[in-house]
Amino acid sequence: ISPQEAMLRADGRTLLVVVDTNRPEQVEDADLLMACNRVAVIDHHRVAATYIHNAALGFIEPYASSVGELMTEVLQEVVDQNDILRCEAEALLSGIVLDTKSFTIRTGERTFDAAAYLRRAGADTTDVKKLLQTDMDDTVAKYKILQSAKLYRDLAIAVPEEPQNRVVAASAADEL
């Protein structure tokens, strides 16, 4: 649902679950974060200096490859594998594939165990690959960012000429 719809539905019993970040400035909607009294944070990044302070639950595991890996481990403990929908398994597997660059970085035994579990739950790797494909406009935008990169003290720095969506910007940053 949209942040606006979530804001309309939120009440005193609402639990807002924030995934893949623990920084309030990176959430989809800061107003929604502030409006919810109960917040859970599930993340695989190190705790930032500006972490979400009002979290009732913090599941932050920097040694995990991805939030997909963490959530798969949770699912294995609380849900019967047959109850996981194929689209859910594919969404989790796509997160693992994306964050590990197709299992080439930040992987460990837990990563592969999670992927195997999701395959058994019905995730199709061909469909996962399709989920991760970008359209031509996003590809062009990414390569414009890469083309603008400059080296400074052995670091590549790129500043897009136009505002980009976060997925395109993150993809370009991964390439640098």
Regions found by a protein language model. Give the residues of each.
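Catalytic-core regions built around general acid/base machinery
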Residues: 31-37, 114-117
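Short alpha-helices
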Residues: 44-114
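Fold-independent oxyanion-binding glycine-rich loops
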Residues: 3-4, 19-22, 42-45, 74, ...
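Hydrophobic/aromatic beta-strand patches that form the interior of the parallel beta-sheet core
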Residues: 15-17, 38-42, 57-60, 156
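N-terminal small/polar loop signature for handling phosphorylated ligands or for N-terminal nucleophile
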Residues: 1-35
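Short helix/loop capping segments that flank catalytic or ligand/cofactor-binding pockets
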Residues: 26-28, 50, 105-106, 167
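Hydrophobic helix-and-loop "lid/oligomerization" segment in the mid-to-C-terminal part
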Residues: 1, 5-15, 98-176
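Solvent-exposed alpha-helices and their adjacent loops that cap or buttress functional pockets
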Residues: 8-11, 31-34, 51-52, 84-86, ...
